[in-house]
Swiss-Prot record:
GO MF: acylphosphatase activity
Gene: acyP
EC number of this enzyme: 3.6.1.7
Organism: Rhodopseudomonas palustris (strain BisA53)
Protein name: Acylphosphatase
Higher taxonomy: Bacteria, Pseudomonadati, Pseudomonadota, Alphaproteobacteria, Hyphomicrobiales
Catalysed transformations (reactions): an acyl phosphate + H2O = a carboxylate + phosphate + H(+)
Keywords recorded for this protein, A-Z: Hydrolase
Amino acid sequence: MIRLVTMRGRVQGVGFRAFVEFQATGLDLEGWVRNRRDGSVEALFSGPADAVEAMIALCRQGPSAAHVAALADEEAHPDQLRLRRAGERFSGLPTV
């Protein structure tokens, strides 16, 4: 299962990307996370459906300083995994 997830609200400047990277690594997911200039955080998760769904649930909550006002998720294409840094299973990417 591969899902593209976008979180909106107080999700930048609160450790959200580090939270996502830590949790996704713990769930043995592949993918990436990045800030967007519009103030949202975007992440791609790839792995077993139960692990991806658990990660999406964690994103709805976020780290303690965050407030997720909205979360959207959609199917993603495997080609989007190419955005990861070479040799990494899960990458924190630059802001777009």
